[in-house]
């Protein structure tokens, strides 16, 4: 890591183990230890600024958010290893902020667009197999972030050197599944290829949802 950041003025730390599947140890190694290694290398090599890619999951507490901002505290009721380890990693990064190393954290949510190998491929695979499910009535509101928006935000954060400040990042307003890009894409593919309509399922209470995840 030292060799990778040597002679660099700025570093964008965007690597992480995302998703909700995998052993706890792997999330710790990549998200927490990996961030610690990046911070240590930046300090050792005299890097001037570090932009850390975080996630809104670090403040999720099981409730819906509307108009949330960076004043929300970290969650303490984690639903997955990803959220918990990313919260710890964000703290590691922000605590390193100093006059020597300017640090900020951004929290883009559900990044999509060219190069996506995480969100849309899985949604399309489930739809193709006729196994896509919609939890609730399909009107759930979720902020998403196009990859171009995320990239612009990282560059803007670097320019502003927002030391120790995490900005919620997402669409200009929440979108609903039925009117989102994913909904339009799925409708077009269903009509063209004859895929099954996604099956709505009742929204389970939170404890039942956790049990299902396990």
Language-model regions, residue ranges each:
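NAD(P)H-binding glycine-rich loop region in Rossmannoid oxidoreductase-like domains
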Residues: 1-30, 41
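Glycine-rich NAD(P)-binding loop of the Rossmann-fold in SDR/ketoreductase-type enzymes
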Residues: 10, 26-37, 45, 84-85, ...
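Catalytic helix-loop patch of NAD(P)-dependent Rossmann-fold dehydrogenases
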Residues: 29, 64-111, 132-135, 140
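Conserved Rossmann-fold NAD(P)-dependent oxidoreductase catalytic core, especially the SDR/UDP-sugar
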Residues: 33, 37-82
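Conserved sequence/active-site signature of Rossmann-fold short-chain dehydrogenase/reductase
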Residues: 58-59, 111-113, 150
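Alpha-helical substrate-binding/gating segment
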Residues: 124-133, 142-183, 188-195
């Amino acid at each position: 890591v030292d060799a990778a950041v040597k002679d660099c003025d700025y570093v964008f730390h965007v690597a992480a183990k995302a998703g909700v599947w995998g052993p706890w140890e792997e999330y710790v190694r990549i998200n927490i230890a990996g961030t610690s290694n990046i911070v240590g290398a930046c300090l050792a090599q005299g890097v001037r600024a570090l932009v850390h890619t975080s996630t809104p999951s670090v403040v999720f507490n099981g409730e819906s958010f509307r108009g949330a901002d960076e004043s929300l505290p970290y969650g303490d009721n984690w639903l997955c290893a990803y959220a918990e380890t990313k919260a710890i990693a964000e703290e590691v990064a922000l605590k390193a902020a100093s006059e020597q190393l300017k640090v900020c954290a951004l929290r883009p949510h559900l990044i999509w667009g060219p190069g996506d190998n995480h969100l849309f491929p899985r949604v399309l695979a489930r739809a193709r197999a006729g196994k896509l499910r919609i939890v609730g009535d399909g009107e759930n509101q979720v902020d998403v972030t196009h990859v171009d928006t995320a990239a612009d935000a990282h560059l803007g954060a670097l320019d502003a050197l927002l030391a120790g400040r995490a900005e919620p990042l997402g669409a200009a307003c929440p979108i609903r599944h039925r009117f989102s890009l994913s909904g339009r894409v799925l409708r077009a593919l269903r009509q063209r290829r004859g895929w099954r309509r996604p099956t709505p399922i009742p929204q389970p209470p939170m404890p039942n949802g956790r049990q299902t995840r396990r």
